[in-house]
């Protein structure tokens, strides 16, 4: 099938869910009731749901069948060992703690690593800084709740939608090392490598960049955590774009990548394709003390360490999903679907970030130049898209980034992006064409779209529950 312009979906659809069609008047009222916040809409009022790919896609038949093998023992479940063995095989990590989802892992490892740095290196909590190529929102939130200042050190091309770069998710290595020296290595409890880099547009990190970042971390004895939600997509981009690895399999690239971290935290609801589940895993006995402390916290916060808030069937399904999500033909189809959508949007004059994994990212700042960043242009665009076509999307910009917890001032955002997140094996090319057609209508009315302001603003992770109004 190498000579075809577009590959069809590499699966057969066996079960379908009917969706409700609504009128423009209905949607206008629904978004007002939701406080101009698409997180607060009811799912039955959504025609195409592009809010997230986290737990919203289809599962494979093998994943569904694996549920029947579930051992629901409170401790020592054989389903736990099936999952732990999958982690060893895929990532090469010896110690596994399952969690209900990614943030369950974050709320465990972050305070443990801070405490360890404080006890062993004399970390000053008033000067504590953590670094990433770009923190995911909950990772940032947990870090800030534990008193850390977060610092994203990304390359200059990362958010420039006019520039193509094979690895826009890369660390700016010079800024990383300068930042460590500036605050003092003892005040840096961890570095997070986010793959793919969601906030930059699902952009990958090269293996060369991972290696160099890890060398810096080793130099200053700082542990590296791999934020692994989209590990398989990142491996695919390495295979396709990093010449040294063009003949490697996805499995080989994945295993190699995880040599350049000390632990992984994962929302398994993305590339592992499950509707619920997460992982916190440690490479070897160099992190055994951290692992033991995290197991203790897991009991209190998630559940016994051999189930971590998951039923046995869910752990079996996750063990299969980790492998299924790395299929070469699957990843090729998934990335080509994103590319098709981005190319279609750009043909009608809608500027997008370079195609990455899991989503198309529209440059809302360029589509709505009359709306300043403090009036959240990407959120305003999301509301308009819903009104026009019943499509739910999500803002990745100033609203999500939030305020400086110390000064209360809005943090400067490098780009105002609207994310059109594609759930796995859920929508077809016809849906992509519909989205493009909807944007034609949105673009025609762009100059009339209004900015937004708060009527209710939570202090942490405000984008989830805030309420807004048009200005």
Swiss-Prot record:
Its cofactor is pyridoxal 5'-phosphate. It is an enzyme of class 4 (lyase). Pathway: Amino-acid degradation; L-tryptophan degradation via pyruvate pathway; indole and pyruvate from L-tryptophan: step 1/1. NCBIfam families: PRK13238.1, tnaA_trp_ase. This is Tryptophanase. Keywords: Lyase, Pyridoxal phosphate, Tryptophan catabolism. The keyword DNA damage does not apply. Belongs to the beta-eliminating lyase family. GO terms for molecular function: tryptophanase activity. InterPro entries: ArAA_b-elim_lyase/Thr_aldolase, Beta-eliminating_lyase, PyrdxlP-dep_Trfase, PyrdxlP-dep_Trfase_major, PyrdxlP-dep_Trfase_small, TNase, Tryptophanase_CS. Pfam families: Beta_elim_lyase. Its EC number is 4.1.99.1. It catalyses: L-tryptophan + H2O = indole + pyruvate + NH4(+).
